[in-house]
Amino acid sequence: MTGRRRAALAVAAALTLLGVAAGAASASEPQRTRLANGLTILVRENAATPVVAASLFVRMGSRWETEDNAGISHLLQQVMLKGTATRSALEIAETAEGLGGGISASADMDYSEIRATALARNWKTLLDLVADVALRPTLPAAEIDGERRAMLTALRSRQDQPFPLALDTVMSRVYGDHPYGRPILGRAAALERIDHDTLVAHHRRFYRAPRIILAVSGDITAREVVAEVARRFAGASTEESAPEPLEPSAAARADRTVLVKPAAQAQVLVAFLAPPTAHPDYPAVKVLATALGGGMAGRLFTEVRDKQGLAYSTGGSYPSRRGPGVFYTQLGTAPANQARAEVAMLGELDRIRREPVSPSELARAKAYLLGQFGLDRRTNARLAWYDAFFEALGVGPDFADRYAQAVEAVTAEDVQRVARTYLTTPTIVTLGPAAQ
């Protein structure tokens, strides 16, 4: 069997898996409705299981924060679950459990989220609960200190762990003054200043109908969901008071940072600025990242770990962003091997710029990438999340299908082209017990 034939079969298998995982979990494509007040509703009818999931995204996150309030979005999301005008924190939790599901909240760079699940027969009460938390949180002052302490503890913990510390450092260096360079947990000094009134003002600024995306997936009908959501969110403010932030440009620059810290494993991270999700090069960079660092068959694993024995762990990542993206590779190694491991990893980054990936490598990367994507979209909770996520990133909920087709169309020449375009100005961070 030729390499081209094997490549075609591998991609076909991955697309079949993608279809089974996503198609079997969804009886319809998401139906998009924009209410008169500006709120966006995405409904995916799926009668395969008697479960309903809702993901409420609001365009609020670290991208809209400054050094003075860094971490406020994550803090707000946690405190919102501590009580509303009609429910205490215990009643929120008990209501969610009584519906046969749960509720949680979090913040990220480009969005913040309230997510909840329930048995399908309880979907209206589920919407009641989500709307209550989103629109009527009391943000009790007595709960703020506890959540703040938890975030400060998590920040200190990241400073004590080699990989999180190295990752936070490389993000800060590659992004410079851009808000993506700050941890989602924020800055300790900023968190100490945030009080009840500050959280109330932040909530009022961002939780407005034009900034809200509500995705619902499950055994429901779109017409009924739209009507019920419109009724529950009728009181949401229609004014847009938080325009897109004026962000400094993230400019590619060669940079090297050495962190000296006691650690059983040395860390080496190499990062590059990369295109946002909406960019035409996004699928090709995803394939590039997978060919290098995706799973046990990626070049970094096979060449640096298996063949040369220079790493305990290694991989690559290219997170999806609305703004400038980042692609990074990472390895953990014995401190004595740090210098050689870094040379080996940089060598693989150089080789993928010089040499096209083989047909089998290309097929494996596509199969792994599409297979993992399909497997991650098997539940209503993940379907709702992806629908809201892609809408928040500005590519629309139908991006999942377009993305699969775009990945299938990526060629070896595309992979080499984006490698030569984006893997040119490395930001390197090393961490170990002594300068290596």
Predicted regions and their residues:
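Mature N-terminal segment immediately following signal peptide/propeptide cleavage
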Residues: 28-57
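Bacterial N-terminal signal peptides
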Residues: 10-20
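His/Glu-based metal-binding/catalytic segments typifying zinc-dependent metallopeptidases
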Residues: 241-297
